[in-house]
Amino acid sequence: MFNTHKVEIEWGGRPLTLETGKIARQADGAVLATYGETAVLATVVSAKEPKPGQDFFPLTVNYQEKTYAAGKIPGGYFKREGRPSENETLVSRLIDRPIRPLFVDGYKNDTQVVITVLQHDLENNPDILSMVAASAALTISGVPFMGPISGARVGYIDGEYVLNPNIDEMPESKLDLVVAGTSEAVLMVESEAQELPEDVMLGAVMFGHKSFQPVIDAIIKLAEVAAKEPRDFQPEDLSELEAKVLAVVENDLREAYKITEKQARYAAVDAAKAKAKEHFFPEGVEETEMSAEQFATIFKHLQAKIVRWNILDTGNRIDGRDLSTVRPIVSEVGILPRTHGSALFTRGETQAIVVATLGTGEDEQMIDALTGTYKESFMLHYNFPPYSVGETGRMGSPGRREIGHGKLAWRAIHPMLPAAEQFPYTIRAVSEITESNGSSSMATVCGTSLALMDAGVPIVRPVAGIAMGLIKEGERFAVLSDILGDEDYLGDMDFKVAGTEFGITSLQMDIKIDGITEEIMKVALEQAKGGRVHILGEMAKAISSSRAELGEFAPRIEVMNIPTDKIRDVIGSGGKVIREIVEKTGAKINIEDDGTVKIASSNGKEIEAAKKWIHSIVAEPEVGEIYEGTVVKTADFGAFVNFFGPRDGLVHISQLAADRVAKTTDVVKEGQKVWVKLMGFDERGKVRLSMKVVDQETGKEIVAEKKKEEVDAE
């Protein structure tokens, strides 16, 4: 019934298996991939024909994690998986980025790649395996995909590169780098690093590229026995039509791309396009040399050609800069004084308002992952409203791009955050992109660094980011610093580097062509370093280190530790005690399993009141100390006084006053505040208190006062 094919190799010390022919046989391509005991299913389906009028390639990648893969049942009312998590969105993008440029130009059939995590061994992260499985499924599907590709994770532990470190090893690693590519070239890099130098980062990229070659060989081996017949697709030859359009629009486009202001430049390009349309689609003529879709494709291609020729021939860019110059920068902090920390970062026509907000443990994000539930105390959210590019558009929940850009900035900042013991706050940074003309994610990095310093978050060092680009024709190439939106769209590489003056904290690279050598990447990294240091210098004009104090409106958090066996006393039955403390003092309280107690409030008196209350619950009263208490009950033989948190003690009638007392209620009443001295404990452990040795007005010991008076008299 099944015509199965399987390839198995040893990779990174674990078995990797690729199997097809048994599951999802109606898909164009389907591969079950297993690494260790983690298993994923990748499927590919591509429409037989493009939709009429389609002028782009509609590729969708969906990575989905099923909770059954880790032996779990989803939470929530419906008990089933819902909308994609942030991690699922990020992994979908991670797979999309290296496979998209490998589809043949002109292929516009609706294509969907679905990767499902079926089993997770809690050791091997399924993201790399999913990339491998998707590549294998595409390679055997018959669609015009110029792969295969593979990917690898590279760690850096004790000065050595580690291939595909398992989940338990990652906390020891100074690097979390994912690299993907073909047998000849690197196509994609995504990473977070602990201030590593450029040569270590480049070495990791090349180590990963070399390490995944056996996987590419395994995919080719599988395709040799299991691949479907390639689809009969021939890219349309538009060279003759392109030459005709070029003759009409070249001068207009060259003039348009000399305009430095973005909106004016776009208007000039639109005018050139409209003029060419009039020429090739005269009014009233039904039969034309080309279709509207062909014209749109050609015009986009010519835009790229004009810009690229100009840069390579003259070294001058669209806005008049040379290759390595960064646009003018203005940094401001404290622009929203009621917030905890704020910054406005402007670089050319790209601008971000970033606001930092500090919270308590209650504000931490709960993340329910396949590996278990954990809390995240640092959140960075990136918003890209349509007005930032002068357009109208959809508003609402963040899209894949916004989630991806936010995570890139998060990776850049995260290594520089203080330890929780040093700074026990939950931090949320929100970047509102108010203008965009290239590299808004790197503006977010710079703005977040400024806003955190303005908020008084003691980051290790300021972080800046820069986006690099590449134009390559044959042996000629130009590396561009701080690229514009057009240079990103029309170029061959998007290369984002963030870090401090001492090293890289995040690197993201997307390459659209083959032939990007190690030498070119080295040039780009060195040029990026110069740009990053320049940007840090510009940022320092606004603020160079974290403020010594938190903002006026930020909450204060103090930390105290209590014995773990006292946690239940502080919480109380059903949370009764801790709720009372919160209600009476107004402070927020978070108690962790190890006995760490975080008390937060914007009012210092509330924090002190809560600390004092908790201390009274967990501490033991000391014999000979004087305490303030409240009479809770009277009896013939004395009064019971609550004096130390939940503790009560007896003041015997003989200890109520210096003179003889006939009746307890002659001296005290229930609810009365009194001063008592702890005299000791009886043979049954009951507390013995005395009021008569304490001045009820001052709370000072009477005997001690008399002795002091005697000493003073002498």
UniProtKB/Swiss-Prot annotation:
Give yes or no: UniProt keyword RNA-binding. Answer: yes
* UniProt domain KH: residue ranges: 555-614
List positions binding Mg(2+).
D488, D494
Which PROSITE patterns does the annotation name?
Answer: KH_TYPE_1 (PS50084), S1 (PS50126)
Name the enzyme's class.
transferase
Q: Which cofactor does it need?
A: Mg(2+)
Single GO BP term: RNA processing
Family matches, as Gene3D superfamilies: GHMP Kinase, N-terminal domain, K Homology domain, type 1, Nucleic acid-binding proteins
Q: Which Pfam families match?
A: KH_1, PNPase, RNase_PH, RNase_PH_C, S1
Q: Does the keyword Flavoprotein apply?
A: no
Give the principal location in a single coarse category.
cytoplasm
Task: Show the catalytic activity.
Answer: RNA(n+1) + phosphate = RNA(n) + a ribonucleoside 5'-diphosphate
For this UniProt record, the keywords arranged alphabetically read as follows: Cytoplasm, Magnesium, Metal-binding, Nucleotidyltransferase, RNA-binding, Transferase
The UniProt entry, under CDD domains, shows: KH-I_PNPase, RNase_PH_PNPase_1, RNase_PH_PNPase_2, S1_PNPase
Enzyme Commission number, as recorded:
2.7.7.8
Ranges for domain S1 motif: 624-692
Cellular-component GO terms for this entry: cytosol
Query: Where found, per UniProt?
Result: Cytoplasm
What GO MF terms are annotated? 3'-5'-RNA exonuclease activity; magnesium ion binding; polyribonucleotide nucleotidyltransferase activity; RNA binding
Q: What does this protein do?
A: Involved in mRNA degradation. Catalyzes the phosphorolysis of single-stranded polyribonucleotides processively in the 3'- to 5'-direction.
Family in the record: Belongs to the polyribonucleotide nucleotidyltransferase family.
Q: Which HAMAP family match?
A: PNPase
Q: What is this protein called?
A: Polyribonucleotide nucleotidyltransferase
* Species this chain originates from: Brucella suis biovar 1 (strain 1330)
